[in-house]
């Protein structure tokens, strides 16, 4: 539930390596 400061509208979350996932076009962690 914490925003990772990255959007994932066109590309996957680069912050995915830090545990972030795409939700509602924005990357979140927990």
Swiss-Prot record:
Per the UniProt entry, the disulfide pairs are 4-20, 8-22, 13-27
* Location, primary (coarse class): secreted
Cited PROSITE patterns: CYCLOTIDE, CYCLOTIDE_BRACELET
Where's the Cyclopeptide (Gly-Asn) crosslink?
1-30
User: What SUPFAM superfamilies does the record tag this protein with?
Assistant: Cyclotides
What are the alphabetically sorted keywords of the record?
Disulfide bond, Knottin, Oxidation, Plant defense, Secreted
The record's account of how the chain is modified after translation = This is a cyclic peptide.
Subcellular localization, as worded in the UniProt entry = Secreted
Which terms does the UniProt entry file under GO BP? defense response
Query: Any one cellular component term from GO for this entry?
Result: extracellular region
Query: What biological function has been recorded for the protein in this entry?
Result: Probably participates in a plant defense mechanism.
Protein family per UniProt: Belongs to the cyclotide family. Bracelet subfamily.
What's written under domain? The presence of a 'disulfide through disulfide knot' structurally defines this protein as a knottin.
Name the record gives this protein = Cyclotide cter-O
What is the originating organism of this protein?
Answer: Clitoria ternatea (Butterfly pea)
Provide the organism lineage as a comma list.
Eukaryota, Viridiplantae, Streptophyta, Embryophyta, Tracheophyta
């Amino acid at each position: 539930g914490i925003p990772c400061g990255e959007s994932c509208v066109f590309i996957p979350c680069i912050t995915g390596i830090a545990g972030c996932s795409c939700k509602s076009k924005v990357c979140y962690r927990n």
